Amino acid sequence: MADLSPAPALREGGPRAHRPSAPSPPPRSRSTSEPEEAELSLSLARTKTRSYGSTASVRAPLGARVIERHVEHRVRAGDTLQGIALKYGVTMEQIKRANKLFTNDCIFLKKTLSIPILSEKPLLFNGLNSIDSPESETVDSSFCQEEEPVVSEEELPPPSPQDPDPKPAQPEEVSARDFLQRLDLQIKLSTQAARKLKEESRDEESPYAASLYHS
């Protein structure tokens, strides 16, 4: 008969069968993974755009600071919250949050709406100041101010010659004294003319009267 007894157990400390272990994965280089992750995050930040109706915030690219400014919109007949949001490039939720509106039809309860608009403001790096230092903010604010165009005198067009408008002759102001003097002079001249005319008529009649007297 065959011996069916179990095989004797191996003694402790005895030789064990060597099991082949799975090969360990090669260590991941940290220097190569960090630039890839940074490039991936930067590309996601650039390609991520705001979709209409979403409440997700827009991630600004590196080296930029998001500034929120409000624009006043006058509500007119026929305006809709969707149309206003499309006009200014914002979401309806942002308009409702800024104006404390509960429904889309509440815009007609107000005469004007405050529209929040996000604008990106670049940061300046001069190698000495940090991003949040007051010096960099001062330089940044002065850099972002709109410069007025300077026009030299040579570029100015010559003034077009304009004919002076002929002004109507204003009547000469005459004082009361001058008026009375002129009136006296006219009366005096009229009197002299009448006297001269009377004398001439008398001289013409005198020869005719003398001839009648002698006849």
From Swiss-Prot:
Residues 196-205 have a biased composition (Basic and acidic residues). The modification Phosphoserine is found at residues 5, 24, 33, 57. SMART domains: LysM. Residues 1-40, 135-176, 195-215 are annotated as: Disordered. Residues 145-156 have a biased composition (Acidic residues). It holds the Pfam family LysM. This is LysM and putative peptidoglycan-binding domain-containing protein 2.
